[in-house]
């Protein structure tokens, strides 16, 4: 039976009035568990390729699916051993999903609503197998092809959670051009969802994060909040609110879900809160002065000091506590402090995908997926249009084995070479990032202008033009990455321990 392994991710969500151009932006690092590396690929899924009857590899749950899926683009695992694991995607209706941010709920919640875990058959006692619920493997595949808006996505996901349950605690992001919703699972069948305020950013490590919930809104207009229909009764029946004491866990028509449902452990203070603190410190430095890397009350969402760009998101999701005593590549602090906390940009990142839905662009070309593979400290994201029938081979045809013919493995090789000589190779890494992002912005503007000038409105011609732009971006990435690999290899070769600074008389 396949093993269910937890992922380790970091998420940033940017409301449309907090972003530099009015877009909604949802972004997440997809990090494997310690000691594991998952190759990634960028693929487009046609309606005919979408299953009509779905069976989970990990939980064995079986679900009949609607017969009207739409096309969507995703960045899943290459290896099928743990199922599809779509991780990040945008459909042709400009709805985006990122799933999942692994979180944790406390033991009282798990006792009241246990996770729905696969129970293998007990042949000796004549008991058949009992399937588990849905999880990270399944969620995007079950939701994204069938929804027209982010709200619809929340409602479809909620129905699936309540019907089949889940075997793990997760945060799920769903967005469209107007709204971003963040869903957190509560035990096996319960859930809450909060809309990211338009003028704010949400910052989320691997920890249940929502820190304010308004039941009055959830059970009336649902403008900003949604939840399980019985959530208040669930809290009261199982005395979950009592754990909050005087800290605001339950107060009239609202509560602090982080206190009621979440955790605050010593591990959180090493693994989770420091990541939230660093994002907070970068986006809202004045207010962040009141918090430390181990604070339990770092806000789930904040109003950034400046409008947030794709470059800000890219930097943060590849960051490693730069400018602090906790930077593993830094010179501040001590050897202990530089390895005290888990950085955001980590060695086992599979990909970072930031999905930008632009209100000023035509519907056909509105959504862009900024994609990077491998450790974010040594690479950068590049823009790819989501509304396509096919994707570039350099990102699509990732092999299970190491190969410089694909972006994923090239980035992994460069990161491993550069890590040991961080400062000596930093110019090559930073120059690559600047060149790729600059080219990407120019390419998007040029493609947008070409579509507007041509006045193309028929779907096939627009899709073909977007695919051509994606190919051009991938070709540039490949050429620039090949040069970068050579530069980093040369520098690292000169710094090998067996190097000797003397040549024979003929050289």
What positions do the PLM features span?
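Short, charged, surface-exposed loops that flank catalytic or proteolytic processing sites
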Residues: 146-152
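Short, well-ordered beta-strand elements within core beta-sheets of diverse protein domains
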Residues: 140-146
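Histidine-centered catalytic/metal-binding microenvironments
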Residues: 433-507
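Short Pro/Gly-enriched beta-strand edge/turn motifs at strand-loop
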Residues: 66-71, 154-155, 331-339
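A contiguous strand-loop segment
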Residues: 3-136, 156-289
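Short, well-structured alpha-helical segments that form the helix of a local strand-helix-strand
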Residues: 153-162, 313-317, 463-466
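Substrate-recognition/cap regions that form aromatic- and gly/pro-loop-enriched pockets
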Residues: 322, 326-455
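Glycine-rich, aromatic-lined ligand/substrate-binding cores of catalytic
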Residues: 232-360
